[in-house]
């Protein structure tokens, strides 16, 4: 499935102007602090928000119900303690488990809004039928939840739940851009881009100036990998999401087996998620049968293992956008070429889209020439971040498949090395 997505952003952080095509393998190059990672994050949160809009609205709904859940929890456990007889609990434990699992096990993600409403209202009715809440200290908690709402007591709580559910339904139906804007404000903690637009087949589907967020057809999942060190670590939202995907078990498709064999041959082993593994969630079994904690193996093996696990779990297909910052980091020079080949073949055989931020000449050239050999060079697009007249601001120049300007920028580093070489010292004498 050939993608034809164009992303335009202007006057945001280090980015002066960028118009980036996502049509296969997109590689952006440039010096540090030129805005490459900013574009990566914009793309990730855009497609993550758009594709998971309903789940994100439900997450917001759970936050809106935070005080209600607290009230239901303490009321239930107080009732158990006061009753004292586990065999004749006055409130059905199964009904409470449904409420507890909404948040604890995140069952809300797989429930309809009407089912969530039914669970909550059923349990509220149970509490009021079995306990004297109206004439207890818990009534003050109810008043705090309802705030200025006119309806109070059980009818007030039922109204509160139904109104929040109705608001969530309305948001899912209309898909306001405000949800994406809130994500950006939370992420960057500063003003928004002056311009941020995404078009698909020349039709604008996302804009900070549009009221609604359309659903892209060519990409329904974005996965952001900014370091192989993120395995098993919870620090950022995109690390949490990546680890969830790495743990989810799925079926291996027939067209994925060749790629899995290629990765296994490169790293001489298999990465697995095993809940019974004693040292970590993730393990790596070498070709000789020895098993290790994946967190303790070479970082290069981790880099390949992430792709291996995503493939195994069925999370990489022709509508996936893999966003990888500096994929060459921690890789041996020989593995840089093999990693680039893996990227090209994933695009060729599966249709995966890539957005790569790199400043490594081996990675840049390997993508170019392996892409040509594999017949997908028309789907490879390079961009170079170039300084503007304004300090700390860069425009992104589209290069097509021409990598010569990128190597010209790499030569700046060689020039700087020569400034400190022995010959330069002699020239100064």
Language model segments and positions:
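Switch/communication elements of ASCE P-loop NTPase nucleotide-binding domains
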Residues: 1-52, 283-418, 422, 429
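Phosphate-coordinating catalytic segments in nucleotide- and nucleic-acid-processing enzymes
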Residues: 6-8, 49-312, 316-319, 388-429
């Amino acid at each position: 499935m050939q993608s034809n997505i164009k992303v335009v952003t202007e006057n945001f952080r280090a980015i002066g102007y960028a118009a980036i095509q996502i049509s296969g393998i997109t590689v952006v190059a440039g010096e540090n602090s030129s805005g490459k990672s900013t574009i990566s994050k914009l793309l990730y949160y855009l497609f993550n928000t758009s594709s998971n809009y309903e789940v994100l609205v439900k997450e917001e709904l759970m936050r809106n119900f935070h005080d209600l859940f607290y009230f239901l929890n303490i009321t239930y456990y107080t009732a158990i303690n006061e009753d004292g007889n586990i065999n004749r609990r006055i409130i059905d434990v199964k009904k409470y488990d449904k409420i507890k699992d909404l948040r604890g096990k995140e069952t809300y993600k797989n429930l309809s809004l009407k089912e969530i409403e039914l669970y909550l209202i059923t349990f509220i009715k149970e509490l009021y039928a079995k306990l004297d809440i109206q004439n207890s200290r818990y009534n003050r908690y109810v008043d705090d939840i309802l705030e200025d709402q006119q309806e109070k007591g059980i009818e007030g709580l039922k109204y509160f739940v139904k109104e929040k559910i109705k608001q969530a339904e309305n948001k899912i139906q209309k898909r306001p851009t405000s949800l994406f804007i809130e994500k950006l404000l939370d992420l960057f903690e500063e003003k928004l881009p002056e311009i941020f637009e995404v078009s698909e087949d020349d039709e604008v589907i996302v804009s900070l100036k549009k009221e609604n967020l359309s659903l892209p057809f060519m990409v329904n999942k974005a996965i952001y990998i900014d370091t192989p060190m993120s395995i098993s670590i919870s620090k950022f939202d995109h690390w949490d999401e990546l680890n969830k995907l790495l743990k989810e078990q799925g079926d291996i498709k027939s067209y994925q087996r060749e790629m899995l064999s290629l990765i296994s041959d490169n790293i001489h082993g298999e990465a697995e998620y095993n809940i019974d593994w004693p040292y970590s969630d993730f393990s790596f079994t070498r070709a000789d049968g020895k098993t290790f904690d994946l967190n303790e193996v070479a970082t290069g093996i981790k880099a390949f293992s992430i792709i291996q696990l995503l493939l195994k779990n069925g999370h990489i297909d022709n509508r996936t956008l893999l966003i990888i910052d500096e994929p060459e980091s921690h890789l041996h020079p020989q593995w840089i070429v093999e990693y680039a080949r893996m990227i090209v073949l994933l695009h060729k055989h599966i249709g995966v889209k890539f957005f790569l931020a790199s400043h490594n000449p081996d990675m840049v050239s390997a993508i170019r020439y392996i892409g040509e050999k594999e017949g997908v060079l028309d789907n490879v697009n390079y961009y170079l971040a170039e300084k503007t007249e304004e300090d700390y601001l860069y425009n992104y120049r589209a290069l097509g498949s021409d990598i010569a300007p990128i190597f010209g920028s790499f030569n700046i580093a060689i020039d700087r090395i020569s400034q400190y070489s022995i010959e330069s010292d002699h020239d100064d004498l």
